[in-house]
Amino acid sequence: MQPLLVLATLLGSALAGTIPLQSANYHGYKVVRLSGEDTSKISHIVSQLGLETWKFPKSANANVDIVVPPKKIAEFEKMSHAAGLKKQIMHEDLGRSIASEMSFRPYSYGGANDTWFQSYHKYEDHLKFMKDFQSAHAENTEIVTSGKSHEGRDITGVHVWGSGGKGSKPAVVFHGTVHAREWITTMTVEYILNQLLEDKEAGAALLDKYDFYIFPITNPDGFVFSTDHDRMWRKNREQNEKGCYGTDLNRNWPYEWDGDGSTTDPCSETYRGPSPGSAPETKASTSFIKGLADGAGVKMFVDWHSYSQLFMTPYGYSCSARAPNDDVLQEMASSFADAVKAVHGTSFTTGPICSTIYQANGNSVDWVVDEIKGETAFAAELRDTGMHGFVLPPDQIIPSGEETWAGVKAMFSKLK
């Protein structure tokens, strides 16, 4: 969910998407965290130098994570020092960090083997993983697709059920990789999928109550582009006006679509699209979830993002509105955060989306709660809080999976 508040393009036409297959080169780029009491000083630096931000503060003394290209480093250092801002280096060389992260391990047949969660993977291997997982558990799983992406890829997931039989229980829907560069969500959602059947006692207890629909990659075109051409790509790959590419799929859902938490600029990272629900990926997801709602109903929806370590409740479109069952949602979110912390000491902040991270209209969580009356819905921001940001080292995949699975189990214990 994390937005890029782009005040100027990082790589000219490459980041804006005007050259669809140009590979972005981030060697020599620094990612720097600034903080200070007067955030207007930071805004001035970002604006004057035309820099990209990974994260911008909601209040004074909050952190701002900024990407600085080589040719602007000297001026950035001069201006930040003159403004008296605190500085911390997140990535000394973003390109080197990306290269290390992209050491994809070859995939071996057989599902979640000992090496799967030790590295990130290409799109084709994720498809193989899901198919192998389903084959290994054919008696209570099936491959499902919600529809096709703009470029014609299937939006693939796995349906897992328990003793009641296929489709007999209320649905739980987990979405990963809505934003293409948030790779830790892909792996963590797959870790949850694996644990539903590997954690025999806890998994069986959940599957006897609910049918799970797990979609590790809901933005396949964007994800492929992020692995093959631009690691920092966020949106889908539709071509827009001005020759720019991509709609922000978490600003395109057809509920409270037209608001301050997105933009009409086709070149912006938070472009909401030309109309509510216009993106093929959004159409596919809304249609699929509506079908579940018309069946046994939707018990829970979680939209998994990174980064910032947050577990949030509705709403995103308004900072004053609250869901009808807000007290229950807050209790569940707190249970998630407490259980996560007990595993590796990772702290998550909880609260409504708008007041916790930023205003976001046209998002999936609000749509699920108000349009199809899903009982519970949450938006998560996984590891970390900014030391690595979107480029999270592979050695954090398993810890992220372990703590998130603990949080999921705890959250369900509060669900009646």
From Swiss-Prot:
What sections of the sequence does the record tag as coiled-coil?
A: none
Enzyme Commission (EC) number: 3.4.17.-
Subcellular location field: Secreted
One example of the protein's molecular function in GO is: metallocarboxypeptidase activity
Protein residues bound to Zn(2+): H179, E182, H305
> SUPFAM superfamilies given for it?
Protease propeptides/inhibitors, Zn-dependent exopeptidases
Record-level GO cellular component terms: extracellular region
* Disulfide-linked positions: C244-C267
- Its protein name is Metallocarboxypeptidase A-like protein MCYG_01475
* Source species: Arthroderma otae (strain ATCC MYA-4605 / CBS 113480)
